[in-house]
UniProtKB/Swiss-Prot annotation:
The active site is at E211, K347. Homodimer. HAMAP family: Enolase. CDD domains: enolase. It comes from Penicillium chrysogenum (Penicillium notatum). The lineage of its organism: Eukaryota, Fungi, Dikarya, Ascomycota, Pezizomycotina. Pathway: Carbohydrate degradation; glycolysis; pyruvate from D-glyceraldehyde 3-phosphate: step 4/5. Its EC number is 4.2.1.11. This is Enolase. GO terms for cellular component: phosphopyruvate hydratase complex. It is an enzyme of class 4 (lyase). The keyword tRNA-binding does not apply. It comes from the Eukaryota. Belongs to the enolase family. GO terms for biological process: glycolytic process.
């Protein structure tokens, strides 16, 4: 079925920054996708095209990316007349049209919007939900797997004030019998945590960060973990709900010294207290011994390969590469060869097309890795990643706290999918790392 119209516009993300929305029109109607954007972005990600005109939106406008869709990509793709169901061919065409290795000419934000909207058009043409179409594209088996929602309930690092260096503390309801029960448990713990934070740190501690987590003025990881442990206990889920962290350590790596500064938000930080990667690894291990930590993301800086391999050899929980791998096939291949981590954080806007995202997941699965599908800190009401998580059988999704509509949009979409699939779906639960084999 041919595409009759492709139109892009500039809309706003959850941080009030412009982002790209794309409409693809076929005989089945209008199919729309909105592209997200990240706050802490990896060096090796594809290029998110921003206008750089400081007189508008502080230079963050996306009018050039929008223009590239409307004037270049749209007309060319319509003329090419590729079947929307042939996602690989569509994405290959988009990449060739751009012609750069990092999508820097047309912008990954322009290309991704088109890629995702085309997938929605294809699902409509087949008369199936988006997750089922993605499952077909990826060749995943049945039954469908509903992911464990990793809920970012406490924020630090670049996402919050306070001195806390680690960026995200997540609760992981992996012993719940179903997705909806897991989400309920998470929501209940979140409410307890919010009340506790206000009681201990004052009313403003209930204020939420970019991803819906609370951001009290916490100094250390232990303090954060104690607070979360107490909230889990008060909600009645001790021993049932686990914890995951996204350290985002590239943000506090001192490259010249090859050390990590846990006091990086303090301009007067004391260099004698900076940690070597071995010391930081020991800190993680001591935390994992004391708290029910099942997953650590970006424990080391994105190019500190030696540290990753050292840590991988000596720990048994999930080690997730985000800044390390940036959903990039070459970086994933290197991480597999160097035995750096054992799970991929999949962000579609780091690689820029649906086909390449599916391939990144397949490459990771092939080496026995887990795959966690992820939102970005600048999100929208678009719920495509919920369908991607289910379609790929990823078994884990990270999409913020059970707060703020742009986060809940994804979680609510999975609730709908759960209801629709009924007995034809299983909850990944404690097998979230190997859900693709369920």
């Amino acid at each position: 079925m041919p595409i009759s119209k492709i139109h892009a516009r500039s809309v706003y993300d959850s941080r009030g920054n412009p982002t790209v929305e794309v409409d693809v029109v076929t005989e089945t109607g209008l199919h729309r996708a909105i592209v997200p954007s990240g706050a802490s972005t990896g060096l090796h990600e594809v290029v998110e095209l921003r206008d750089g005109d400081k007189t508008k939106w502080g230079g963050k406008g996306v009018l050039n990316a929008v223009k590239n869709v409307n004037d270049v990509i749209g007309p060319a793709l319509i003329k090419e007349n590729i079947d929307v169901k042939d996602q690989a061919k569509v994405d290959e065409f988009l990449n060739k049209l751009d012609g750069t290795p990092n999508k820097g000419k047309l912008g990954a934000n322009a290309i991704l919007g088109v890629s995702l909207a085309v997938a929605k058009a294809a699902a409509a043409e087949k008369g199936v939900p988006l997750y089922a179409h993605i499952s077909d594209l990826a060749g995943t088996k049945k039954p469908f797997v509903l992911p464990v929602p990793f809920q970012n309930v406490l924020n630090g690092g670049s996402h919050a004030g306070g001195r806390l260096a680690f960026q995200e503390f997540m609760i992981v309801p992996d012993t719940a019998p179903t997705f909806s029960e897991g989400l309920r448990q998470g929501a209940e713990v979140y409410q307890e945590l919010k009340a506790l934070a206000k009681k201990k740190y004052g009313q403003s501690a209930g204020n939420v960060g970019d991803e819906g987590g609370v951001a009290p003025d916490i100094q250390t990881a232990e303090e954060a973990l104690d607070l979360i442990t107490e909230a889990i206990e008060q909600a009645g889920y001790t021993g049932q709900i686990k914890i995951a962290m996204d350290v985002a350590s590239s943000e506090f790596y001192k490259e010249d010294a090859k050390k990590y500064d846990l006091d990086f938000k303090n301009p007067e930080s004391d260099p004698t207290k900076w940690l070597t990667y071995e010391q930081l690894a020991d800190l993680y291990k001591s935390l994992a011994a004391k708290y029910p930590i099942v997953s650590i993301e970006d424990p080391f800086a994105e190019d500190d390969w030696e540290a990753w391999s050292y840590f991988y050899k000596t720990s048994d929980f999930q080690i997730v590469g985000d800044d390390l791998t940036v959903t990039n096939p070459l970086r994933i291949k290197k991480a597999i060869e160097l035995k750096s981590c054992n799970a991929l954080l999949l962000k579609v806007n780091q690689i820029g097309t649906l086909t390449e995202s599916i391939q990144a997941a397949k490459d990771s699965y092939a080496d026995g890795w887990g795959v966690m599908v992820s939102h970005r800190s600048g999100e929208t009401e678009d719920v495509t990643i919920a369908d991607i998580a289910v379609g790929l059988r990823a078994g884990q999704i990270k999409t913020g706290a059970p707060a703020r509509s742009e986060r809940l949009a994804k979680l609510n979409q999975i609730l709908r999918i759960e209801e629709e699939l009924g007995a034809n779906a299983v909850y990944a639960g404690e097998k979230f790392r190997t859900a693709v084999n369920l």
